[in-house]
Amino acid sequence: MSKLGKKPILIPSGVQINIEGDMISVKGPKGTLSQRLSPYIKVAIEENKLWVQQNEESIVRRSQRKMLRTFQGTYWSLIKNMITGVTEGFEKQLEIVGVGYRAQLQGNKVSLQLGYTHPIVLEPPVGVSVEVPAPNVVVVKGIDKQKVGQFAAEVRSWRKVNVYSGKGVKYRNEVVKLKEGKKA
């Protein structure tokens, strides 16, 4: 059994969990998320606790036990993130550092000027919202942790931080260790 799989997930009030076949859906105050479950996993709900268990019936060989433990921990984390997403939501903050580098909103799209000859216009996926509180700060919010992280990584990938000058797009809490330049 995985370390996480031994612990139950507490279901907060205001959250409804529905399990139909191989699909689990979590509904909360911020929205609804659903996830397909592996045939190697069983999900059981007791009162306000959710247990992620290995499906012993799906084992054909003994070598599959290790794989089942990894699935159990992975699905435990996925379901926990779904519950956190529909109750609190997720947020990633990006900082833009550099002269002339800035961001602005155009409707629901974000326009980035990162030193290229043209502005980069990115449209967030469904369920993800973007805010630009300052020209050098981009805030990505949503209920799906995977989509929020993926879109933030996509924004960052257009101009990663230069390790010599420190210019580029970085996460708010990211520490960039600057390298020393060439000495003559």
From Swiss-Prot:
Pfam families: Ribosomal_L6. One of its GO terms (molecular function) is rRNA binding. GO terms for cellular component: cytosolic large ribosomal subunit. The keyword rRNA-binding applies. Keywords: Ribonucleoprotein, Ribosomal protein, RNA-binding, rRNA-binding. It comes from the Bacteria. Part of the 50S ribosomal subunit. This is Large ribosomal subunit protein uL6. It comes from Pseudothermotoga lettingae (strain ATCC BAA-301 / DSM 14385 / NBRC 107922 / TMO) (Thermotoga lettingae). The lineage of its organism: Bacteria, Thermotogati, Thermotogota, Thermotogae, Thermotogales.
